[in-house]
């Protein structure tokens, strides 16, 4: 029985994680969790799973819940996330919060000796050198929840990492993959949130449409697998059936295929190296797909991916700037303050004004993160 700590319980990844826990009560117990502002959904989760510790974001929500659930210990804010992440009775932390707020709870959980299932890619994007060093020192494995990195982990199972030629991350191309740059000036939030293949949260769906999401995943792959940026390739795979691939020095490829359902990589991160049966509404059959399509990325059409590669190669605090600027720009788009095509421009503006600080410590990363957010907000 694994005792699970789940950060971001009401989000897309959190909801699908709860489904796995619900379907496997003999294997998993949810002992602690966090959620943000969705009180209705949060209450239902507490009532069903009966966690011992819960963190919410606002003080008023904590006070309300304390009166409703006197047997549960409640916390709030970032400190609440950090308390829950290190809950003594938990075995595995699955960090599914969105944004750089997930960094400190992950580091705290590593220090506490928890196993880590990481869905919060910003943790590695902003502080990969710190997080991976801490994990090595504590002999903690970071198991990826992203479908692409889970696919690579599976493709590398039993292989010699020194024989890797390159990693190939696949991308659907997002909601606007068939639109020209000129056509993006008129797109709406509603249109942007219609992903062709995946069911994801709002921020992630927008990041998929710009391909900033894939850029963050390139950085994440760099840290998780120790592969240079020049040896990480992104290709468009429209069907989202091939989740990613590894090419080896002999020219061969190993790929992981499956239905576009996040329950698959979630359960693999929780049970690695074992697997669980997952009930699907429709069983996946490879014969349902008469063809699988692979396309080169047009970096003029998707400049966000080029910005991310450049930021990753420069390193230091540059990825932190890219991530923070993108979070504010996407929030501005979702709130109607920014046109879709201006998301990239805002991020590029923030990158151009920043001089990267190499090997930043945690305080420097957090300071640059806050300064970047404040700056981009002035541009909205």
Curated annotation (Swiss-Prot):
| This protein's record includes keyword Glycosyltransferase | no
Q: Where does NADPH bind?
A: 10-13, 36-38, 120, 122, 201
Using the UniProt record, name the top-level EC class of this enzyme in a single word.
oxidoreductase
Entry cofactors:
Mg(2+); Mn(2+)
**Record EC number:** 1.1.1.267
Please name the pathway.
Isoprenoid biosynthesis; isopentenyl diphosphate biosynthesis via DXP pathway; isopentenyl diphosphate from 1-deoxy-D-xylulose 5-phosphate: step 1/6
GO biological process entries: isopentenyl diphosphate biosynthetic process, methylerythritol 4-phosphate pathway involved in terpenoid biosynthetic process
Residues noted as binding Mn(2+) in the record, renumbered to the chain: 146, 148, 217
Keywords annotated in UniProt: Isoprene biosynthesis, Manganese, Metal-binding, NADP, Oxidoreductase
Q: Which reaction does it catalyse?
A: 2-C-methyl-D-erythritol 4-phosphate + NADP(+) = 1-deoxy-D-xylulose 5-phosphate + NADPH + H(+)
Molecular-function GO term, any one: 1-deoxy-D-xylulose-5-phosphate reductoisomerase activity
Sites binding 1-deoxy-D-xylulose 5-phosphate sit at: 121, 147-148, 172, 195, 208, 213-214, 217
HAMAP family in the record, alphabetically? DXP_reductoisom (MF_00183)
Q: Which family does it belong to?
A: Belongs to the DXR family.
What is its biological role? Answer: Catalyzes the NADPH-dependent rearrangement and reduction of 1-deoxy-D-xylulose-5-phosphate (DXP) to 2-C-methyl-D-erythritol 4-phosphate (MEP).
Give the protein's recorded name: 1-deoxy-D-xylulose 5-phosphate reductoisomerase
- Species of origin reads Listeria welshimeri serovar 6b (strain ATCC 35897 / DSM 20650 / CCUG 15529 / CIP 8149 / NCTC 11857 / SLCC 5334 / V8)
